[in-house]
Amino acid sequence: YGTNRDALLLQLTQGLDVILEIDWQGAAQVLKEWPDALSIFILPPSREALHARLIGRNQDHPDVIQARMAEADETLSKAPQFDYWIVNDAFEVALDELRAIVLASRQRRARVELQHERLLKMLLGEG
């Protein structure tokens, strides 16, 4: 798969919020290049729910589902490396949590410092 780097850079320079749906290995690559990027780990509500979702997709052979469940342990063990965790139990709740994280990230000092630098100087009587 892969993400088009040029398209990503264009979106970032336009000030857009960019959300990448990638695995933990892809997240590690992104964070290596952009250490200030936010990382969000989406957790299933339970192992049973994860298994039921894989079966419910009706796309994979039972052997593939079994392999995916085995891979889930390694994937889930990477969660502590992420900035935020969202439990995807109720979709709308998970979506609201994602929106809240994105909204809060827009106010990080690193993101708004240049935008508000003049205002801060004026408030401090320096400009």
Q: What is the role of each PLM region?
A:
Residues 7, 71, 97-101:
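Alpha-helical elements of Rossmann-like donor-binding domains used by nucleotide-donor carbohydrate transfer enzymes
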Residues 59-60, 77-127:
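NTP-dependent small-molecule kinase module
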